């Protein structure tokens, strides 16, 4: 629980969903209540809501990258959608079973007008993916509008794909030992 509470709690983090706050705060939807990330995660888990993280450029840059990926997984995040990824953190996310997806071209969270209230679906992911596939992602806005875009799957190698398919590198190793 300590590591989960510490994930996304760095005071340099600015969550655009919770303007005026520093560190580990987010907004719980549909209530639009600003609260600690951990508390929001607990509530979303009770509701059965899967989570994604939306990031900017060089997502994951920092000194505690391995724990950043572990904490992200422990919080129940299924995917990270970002403009670009720090190389090692991208690999660590996959090693934890979290899907890294990269915006293509000039597409980003700003020109999609993402506020945090959108329902996000990764279309046909259950049918399987290959390294560096284009993946369709659907954003359903509170207004009812729907926007679909293509994103680049940042699982770059066949080995990484096997780790992801198994839920992470530890699960992959354990399954291959049995």
Question: Which residues does each predicted region cover?
Answer:
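Fe-S-dependent hydro-lyases/dehydratases of central metabolism
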Residues: 1-178
